[in-house]
């Protein structure tokens, strides 16, 4: 398995596969064809079907247009064989083709194609199944975050510290922002309202309403194209931060314990990414919000003092009750049902404990 640095990434919403990935691809292509006087980008399959709502064209044009005029072609009727999120970049000079590149956005902001599949990145983790890792934990008398440190080295904590800071900053921004989200559905931001209303509720309702507010804050920031952390994706980026932020504010957990919880949750997300997929276009929302709920449930269970077996069971419950969940955004926007789905999944992560 790859490093958690390839799972948790700071980027802009609303979609890691439809925004972050295509922008990253455009940046790579412009480096290899910087002297072109015209670009053409053809989007296939899911990228073309929902790309307008996900601002795929905006992400690509923000990179290529300053260099040369760029044409975007939408082909939702064609799916390339490697992955539903296919892109073809073409560069022209004096109307003659000078470069062509086919690449796929495979989820979580990652890129791949047939060539990269032949030369996969170096594995950081020798074990790729939770059953194997759980056996290691029981044998060594250690837990999941210690396995992460064993494989990644102590430098992972500085990276996770940056990730946690970014998550908190997103929530704070989202809690103070108001107005209507872009895209035409006229969805109003609700996070700040939920937070205010929470103070008038009794204890249990107040706690649940605040959790919803924290999740809505990140999900709404993502929907507006703001800065978020993939956990494991942009579309599911609100679940893990909401759960951990809520626990910090209600239980006063130390920053170190939160970072360890991030490591544990990330490990479960990494296993799902490695053995299946976290791409909504490929496996539906069960691979995004479902995996995010599993990650958050595992992180919360660890903070509550759970054993490795209990942590694994919490993650299992977080995922299994999202199985079959489709990726079905209204008008292709990461808003309905995506925003509220993050909030409900955050609550389910607690229910799993």
Give residue spans per PLM region.
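A glycine-rich helix N-cap at a beta->alpha junction
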Residues: 59-74
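Alpha-helical support elements that line or immediately flank enzyme active sites
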Residues: 19-32, 241-252, 297-305
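Non-transmembrane, aqueous-exposed alpha-helical and coiled segments at domain scale
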Residues: 4-12, 23-45, 53-54, 68, ...
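Accessory "access/gating" subregions that flank catalytic or transport cores
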Residues: 168-284
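C-terminal regulatory domains involved in ligand/effector binding and gene-expression control
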Residues: 70-201, 209-210
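Hydrophobic alpha-helical bundle architecture
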Residues: 264, 272-342
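Conserved phosphate/anionic-ligand binding catalytic regions in large, soluble enzymes, centered on
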Residues: 8-26, 225-243, 285-293
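C-terminal auxiliary extensions adjacent to catalytic cores
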Residues: 192, 344-346
